[in-house]
Amino acid sequence: GTDYTSTADLADKTVVAEAGSAGEAAISEDENLSKADYVSKSVQTDCLMEVAAGTADAAVLDLTLANAMIGEGTDYANLKIVDELNAEEYGVAFRKGSDAAAAVDAAFDELKADGTMQALADKYDLALAD
């Protein structure tokens, strides 16, 4: 188990994140995490290695990656996700009315209709956007 209950518990601890990432921004923007001993890493997987090795107390990284790499059946079965700091949403932009936009919309509609998109979301522990 962990004694972690909020970011206040990490104010004097070593926290790692990927340099230039949203995790790094979250650390600098959080009142408590900004007081932590922050160590930047070149890739998010290095952050997990630091926590697993005990050289860092916590890592701030993308939730999708964390869900895929942490927990039972992974190389980091002894680690767990204990908090979500913020949500990021991404989109893809096309010129309005373009053939590319129409093709992608049609593909998404088909993947939703036949259940493929939901199956992929379930497989990777993701939530579909509305």
List the predicted regions and their residue ranges.
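Periplasmic-binding protein-like
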Residues: L63, N67, G71-D109, A127-D130
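Short, well-ordered beta-strand segments
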Residues: T14-A17, A59, A93
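Ligand-binding clefts/hinges and TM-proximal coupling segments of bilobed small-molecule sensing domains
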Residues: A22-V39, A77-E84, A106-D130
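Stable alpha-helical elements in mature extracytoplasmic
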Residues: S6, G23-A26, V43-C47, D62-A66, ...
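Conserved functional loop/turn residues at catalytic and ligand-binding sites
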Residues: T14, T55, G115
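Short helices/loops that flank or line small-molecule/ion binding pockets
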Residues: A8-A11, E29, Q44-V60, T64-L65, ...
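Flexible hinge/capping segments at coil-to-helix
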Residues: G1-T14
